[in-house]
């Protein structure tokens, strides 16, 4: 019997890639604030539900209807710069609690969209130098903005649900997500280094994001774990330690970067999820790849 997974934010820019990937082996319930249209035919393996995930009753109803094996919570306000800070924080934290609470009580394994922004570098007024490089998932998290703080709070909710309900919860901390043929990071690469210092010039291809979500769902783990999702290299094409020293004037005392190695280590995902990134800007920036289609062919 095919397992069922509910994906919130499933019609979002990266969410649709996740749904498309999962639909190859799961029955996917694509949840978003709007339905794509009642007269649009669906793929056999995809259902759509219009749900406001800040309303706990709505997401509980969907979880009760489908009794999913897994829930991927990918819906969020993705930046502190487009909405009032209070709205970003309240929306993200409330939605995360509602979705994870419903999923945990239903006994579903969970994959949560966290963020590299939880470390506090991306939106800081003065970008702090990392404590060590490469950064692993144990690196201190000290955000100064509502978005990054909402992600830290979200991971605490994830830990609570894992403890309370005994389900597996994976918090994915993606780097700056890029899309085949549309690598905006390369525009930053040709400009001032300050434009990429907030994540040490790291990035990740959306196809690799979809891959780590699937790997987390398929994993046989327990409790809560956080994982980086990042490409193996930086997007500038120069040694990462050289970029760090040029921008901050020095490198951390503990710096074990080699060449253009990413500042975000993915060794944990490799070890526990058997996942590693497949894509680099060198081939993906100009790649012609069709956008995912969640509708019937």
List the predicted regions and their residue ranges.
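N-terminal Rossmann NAD(P)H-binding glycine-rich loop of SDR-like oxidoreductase domains
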Residues: 3-24
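NAD(P)H-binding glycine-rich loop region in Rossmannoid oxidoreductase-like domains
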Residues: 51-91
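Conserved Rossmann-fold NAD(P)-dependent oxidoreductase catalytic core, especially the SDR/UDP-sugar
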Residues: 98-144
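Conserved beta-loop-beta element that borders a ligand/cofactor-binding pocket
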Residues: 114, 155-180
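Mid/C-terminal beta-alpha module of Rossmann-like enzyme folds, strongest
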Residues: 210-266, 271-272, 294-296
């Amino acid at each position: 019997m095919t397992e069922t997974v509910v994906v919130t934010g499933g019609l979002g820019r990266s969410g649709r890639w996740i749904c498309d990937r999962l639909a190859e082996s799961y029955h996917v319930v694509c949840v978003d604030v709007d339905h794509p249209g009642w007269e649009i035919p669906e793929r056999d393996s995809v259902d759509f539900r219009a749900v406001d995930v800040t309303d706990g009753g709505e997401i509980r109803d969907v979880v009760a209807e489908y009794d999913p094996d897994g829930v991927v919570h990918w819906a969020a306000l993705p930046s502190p710069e487009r909405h009032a800070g209070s709205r970003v924080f309240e929306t993200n934290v409330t939605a995360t609690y509602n979705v994870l609470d419903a999923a945990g009580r239903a006994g579903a394994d969970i994959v949560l969209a966290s963020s590299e922004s939880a470390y506090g570098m991306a939106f800081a007024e003065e970008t702090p130098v990392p404590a060590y490089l490469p950064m692993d998932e144990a690196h201190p998290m000290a955000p100064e903005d509502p978005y990054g703080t909402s992600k830290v709070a979200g991971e605490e909710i994830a830990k609570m649900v894992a403890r309370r309900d005994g389900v597996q919860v994976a918090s994915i901390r993606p780097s700056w997500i890029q899309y085949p043929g549309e690598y905006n990071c390369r525009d930053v690469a040709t400009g001032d280094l300050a434009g990429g210092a907030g994540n040490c010039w790291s990035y990740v291809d959306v196809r690799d994001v979809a891959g780590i979500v699937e790997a987390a769902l398929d994993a046989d783990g327990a409790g809560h774990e956080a994982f980086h999702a990042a490409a193996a290299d930086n997007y500038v094409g120069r040694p990462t330690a050289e970029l760090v020293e040029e921008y901050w004037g020095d490198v951390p005392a503990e710096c074990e970067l080699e060449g253009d190695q990413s500042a975000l280590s993915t060794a944990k995902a490799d070890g526990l999820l058997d996942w590693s990134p497949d894509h680099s800007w060198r081939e993906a920036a100009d790649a012609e790849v069709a956008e995912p289609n969640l509708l019937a062919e």
